Amino acid sequence: LLIHGKLPNAAELTGYKTKLRRLRGLPWTVLDALETLPAASHPMDVMRTGVSVLGCTLPEKDDHNTAGARDIADRMLASLGSILAYWYRFSHSGERIDVETDDDSIGGHFLHMLHGTPPPQSWVKAMHTSLNLYAEHEFNASTFTARVIAGTGSDLYSCIAGAIGALRGPKHGGANEVAFEVQKRYETPDEAEADIRQRVANMVLDVASAPAIY
């Protein structure tokens, strides 16, 4: 829907999933670059770097045609999880994993690579719920950044790399890290609700409570 402007029918969805599975692989240039990044790298920096190297290896046509841009968007949709998981497994345990799994979905593919085994369906469902919520996010800083870069006539890889840079900031995607730290304070849902209500009443809000909308 975000890339092609409409929801697919059953046959189109099957074909699209097949296409995305074909695009999960990474060129050797990207793999080599990922292997140079230290384990202490921020995951957003890793993805930004992966997108930049991918753009150098498989550049967009100078005419920026719509069909080509959609193909690039599909490739990034399919391979960003591969970029992150390959770097993580290599940098933390020295494993050169196969990023081309047969998993039926983006969430299943990423979780399989991250943990090395097919994930439970409950994990996949949770991952997809999270991805859908992010896709529903309004006109935020990273979207704004991507549009500004696109408005200069730059290529799609630059747009996405810039958007990732904006998303990395503590007042945007970095707020999720703050939210996770908040969640770790609590042992039970009741404890969480009571504390959050108290914080709201006292006007004590974390950055994760109110990210900027552009």
Feature-to-residue mapping (PLM):
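Hydrophobic alpha-helical bundle cores within soluble ligand-binding/oligomerization subdomains
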Residues: 1-214
